[in-house]
């Protein structure tokens, strides 16, 4: 470190940067003392430098299955088999239905689902999630294909979908590998709910025409136009409506019936759950049978009595490398952000939700690796963009899945369908598939009770919710995504910029016995109970806007001392607002130290012109105000500050020093937990004593003025035994000499005092450090534990909490309360 420091000093000297004495702690070094060292660039590089163990952990995280695969057992196997087969029965008809939403042949849905189930288990951090074709993503892909083919009619729909999946997968895989999974935290629940609700309404509205057999309805238009055109086309309803409406009714009836039977017969609840889960399979088999009876002599699907699925090729007929030429890449480039955003929203939201329900934590970065890898390799077998499915994940979780390996059993079932059941799929009615889609997306609509909960929690976000839904309905799903995410980001910035700070007052809080809480009318009993109860000083808002009891007595901390708590960080966005509020409040409740500073009216600044002509300047109210002595900033909600905020604090300090001249305003900081924040404050001149001697005038408790030398801070370190403690010089506090007697109970944490805690981290106290005898007495507490400083003695104006900071500020002002 010495060479690094020397090199840094040489660079500073070469560039003409003066040495900052505030960062020079040599005057504070005493053997046995705890002195804080400033974090350096080398420290930062050491923190982010990869280590051997870190690299091994990273590789282990890439393949999380190694943590559980060697513990696999028959019980897990049975649970995975049941869940995997159950999901397999659902995913086969769903996959083909969703492929139709994507403007693709039905087999593409099976390809996509197969790849997701085969690959996901090796990279999964969620046992419940299922990756495959989903309704919302399929609709987005269908819209993209339709838009691209308008300008490039020669492009094959399958090529567009596969290329889109490959590029999106590569980007997601990259984000996952560099561990950028935290970006999903920028998308709030309200934005996700609005997106899912708007998408579900759009998808359901687009499927009504297929359900009813209404021809010539463009389901790719804006949702409101689709609804209007569908209503206009009701007179043109065909026989498909009989198949579709009865299928939709059957799906809802079976679910309702199984739910009721599960409630009536709790012991058979699991059996009724499996019956409900397989309702899609029952409906598809039933309507395949009906369709075969009606159309068994039909060879051309166009000649069927109602629209049917038609030929589904067996096996993987669209395998091969995706198309990656410049022409197709430029055509889909504008739609890649939307695709990535939808993949992220659906997958991470679903996996987090089920992780909380089933008591495990997912790794968002690893989930990005999983869906990225799936979408990167899926196109080689004919897959299009795949992500997590809410309905299938819910089924899988309720079916008793034990590990992610259940996806293998689902993949086997999909593979069996691809090679053995494609001839049966010929007779599936399109209206029955539409009924399945409507039934599936209906669960994605946010219920009114949830919207009402949003309203109770944050009314502004309800506006964002409805804005996203309406934009999705009246424009497109893609625009709905952008609006909700952008609006949520704007609200976040607005809340940071307008985060309210609070001026704090103090009150005594008692741990009250039950008799006192119930309200005893006996004052003697009340006093007796209060004396027995524990109490401490708490700091609450002076504005009383925190819903505290209006009868609670909250007093100002001390005349001329102000405690300010930041509400939500301190940065370039909100620093001006916070410090303006601080300035206005201080000027309103204090006076200048020199009342007659301006001898003539013309000497006064324009923004402080004083009273009108003929009115007295020194009013009784003004004279009675205290002078500004200290500012205490509660940094418990501040993690880091930037250059703008630091400069604003420096400017405010200079302004207050001019206001309090010839006194100097002390700045105390409580709850600073980030060492880089402390470094920034120290570099700005806060938190440390001046290393040069300064003349400071203070009012003593008798009303006189006392001029004292404020010397450099000297460390005091209590030793383990009394024999090890030697007398050392103590810096004055600016309110008297070192041997001045302090009033009891006003232990300071700066120049004349130190914050100390027990070596085992249990007890914390504020103690004066005046003489070696005092240090000898304070080396151990009543329990015999060795006392050590909480923070470095070279940073005396940083305190562990507001109460300690206030004690220090009161002590250093030299003001003694009247007995």
Curated annotation (Swiss-Prot):
Cite the STAS domain residue spans from the record.
Answer: 551-708
Q: Does the keyword Nucleotide-binding apply?
A: no
What induces it, per record?
A: Highly expressed, but only in cells subject to sulfur limitation, and it is turned on by the positive-acting 'Cys-3' sulfur regulatory protein.
Query: What is this protein's tissue specificity according to the annotation?
Result: Mainly found in mycelia.
Which segments show compositional bias classed as Gly residues? 746-755
Keyword Transit peptide in the entry? The reply is no
What name does the UniProt record give this protein? Sulfate permease 2
Biological source species: Neurospora crassa (strain ATCC 24698 / 74-OR23-1A / CBS 708.71 / DSM 1257 / FGSC 987)
- Which gene specifies this protein's sequence? cys-14
């Amino acid at each position: 470190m010495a060479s690094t420091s020397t090199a840094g000093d040489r660079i500073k000297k070469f560039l003409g940067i003066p040495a900052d004495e505030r960062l020079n702690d040599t005057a504070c070094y005493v053997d046995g003392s705890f002195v804080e060292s400033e974090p350096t660039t080398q420290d930062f590089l050491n923190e982010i430098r990869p280590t051997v163990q870190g690299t091994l952990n990273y590789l282990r995280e890439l393949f999380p299955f190694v943590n559980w695969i060697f513990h696999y057992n028959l019980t897990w196997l049975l649970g995975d088999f049941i869940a995997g087969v159950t999901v397999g029965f659902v995913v086969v008809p769903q996959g083909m239905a969703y492929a139709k939403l994507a403007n693709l042949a039905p087999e593409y849905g099976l390809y996509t689902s197969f790849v997701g189930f085969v690959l996901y288990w090796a990279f999964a951090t969620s046992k419940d999630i299922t990756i495959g074709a989903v309704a919302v993503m399929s609709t987005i892909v269908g819209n993209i294909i339709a838009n691209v083919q308008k300008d490039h009619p020669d492009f094959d729909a399958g090529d567009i979908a596969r290329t889109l999946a490959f590029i999106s997968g590569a980007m997601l895989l990259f984000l996952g590998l560099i561990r950028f999974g935290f970006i999903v935290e920028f998308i709030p629940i309200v934005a996700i709910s609005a997106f899912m609700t708007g998408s579900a309404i759009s998808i359901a509205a687009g499927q009504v025409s297929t359900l009813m057999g209404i021809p010539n309805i463009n389901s790719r238009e804006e949702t409101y136009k689709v609804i209007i055109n569908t209503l206009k086309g009701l007179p043109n309803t065909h026989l498909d409506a009989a198949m579709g409406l009865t299928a939709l009714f059957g799906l809802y009836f079976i679910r309702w019936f199984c739910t009721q039977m599960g409630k009536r017969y709790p012991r058979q609840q699991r059996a009724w759950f499996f019956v409900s889960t397989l309702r899609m399979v029952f409906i598809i088999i039933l309507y395949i049978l009906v369709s075969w009876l009606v159309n068994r002599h039909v060879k051309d699907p166009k000649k069927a009595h109602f629209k049917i699925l038609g030929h589904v090729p067996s096996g993987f007929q669209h395998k091969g490398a995706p198309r990656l030429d410049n022409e197709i890449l430029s055509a889909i480039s504008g739609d890649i952000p939307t695709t990535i955003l939808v993949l992220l929203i659906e997958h991470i939201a679903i996996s987090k939700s089920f992780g909380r329900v089933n008591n495990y934590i997912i790794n968002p970065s690893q989930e990005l690796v999983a869906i990225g890898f799936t979408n990167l390799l899926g196109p080689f077998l004919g897959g299009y963009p795949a992500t997590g499915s809410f309905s299938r994940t819910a089924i899988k979780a309720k079916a008793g899945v034990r590990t992610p390996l259940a996806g293998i059993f689902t993949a086997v079932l999909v593979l069996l369908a691809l090679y053995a059941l494609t001839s049966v799929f010929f007779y599936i009615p399109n209206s029955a598939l539409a009924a399945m889609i409507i039934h599936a997306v209906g669960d994605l609509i946010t219920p009114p009770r949830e919207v009402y909960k949003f309203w109770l929690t944050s009314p502004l976000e309800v506006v964002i919710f409805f804005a996203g839904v309406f934009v999705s309905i009246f424009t497109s799903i893609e625009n709905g995504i952008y609006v909700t995410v952008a609006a949520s980001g704007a609200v976040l910035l607005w809340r940071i910029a307008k985060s309210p700070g609070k001026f704090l007052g103090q009150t005594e809080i008692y741990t009250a016995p039950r008799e006192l809480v119930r309200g005893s009318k006996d004052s003697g009993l009340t006093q007796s109970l209060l004396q027995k109860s524990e109490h401490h000083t708490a700091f609450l808002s002076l504005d009383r806007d925190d819903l505290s009891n209006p009868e609670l007595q909250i007093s100002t901390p001390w005349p001329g001392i102000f405690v300010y708590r930041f509400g939500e960080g301190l940065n370039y966005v909100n620093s001006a607002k916070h410090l303006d509020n601080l300035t206005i409040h201080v000027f309103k409740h204090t006076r200048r130290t020199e009342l007659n500073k301006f001898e003539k009216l013309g000497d006064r600044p324009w923004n402080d012109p004083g009273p009108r002509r003929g009115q007295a300047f020194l009013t009784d109210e003004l004279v009675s105000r205290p002078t500004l002595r200290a500012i205490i900033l509660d940094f418990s909600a501040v993690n880091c500050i930037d250059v703008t905020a630091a400069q604003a604090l420096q400017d405010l300090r200079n302004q207050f020093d001019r206001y309090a001249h010839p006194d100097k305003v002390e700045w105390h900081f409580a709850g600073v937990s980030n060492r880089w924040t402390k470094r920034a404050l120290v570099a700005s001149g806060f938190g440390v004593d001046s290393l040069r001697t300064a003349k400071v005038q203070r009012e003593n408790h008798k009303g006189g003025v006392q001029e004292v030398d404020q010397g450099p801070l000297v460390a005091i370190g209590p030793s383990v035994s009394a024999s090890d403690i030697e007398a050392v010089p103590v810096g004055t506090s600016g309110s008297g000499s070192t041997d001045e007697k302090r009033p009891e109970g006003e232990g300071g944490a700066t120049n004349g005092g130190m914050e100390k805690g027990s070596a085992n981290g249990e007890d914390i106290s504020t103690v004066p450090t005046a003489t070696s005898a005092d240090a000898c007495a304070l080396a151990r507490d009543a329990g015999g534990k060795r006392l050590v400083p909480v923070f470095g003695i070279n940073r005396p104006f940083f305190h562990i909490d507001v109460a300690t900071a206030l004690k220090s500020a009161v002590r250093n002002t030299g003001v003694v309360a009247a007995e």
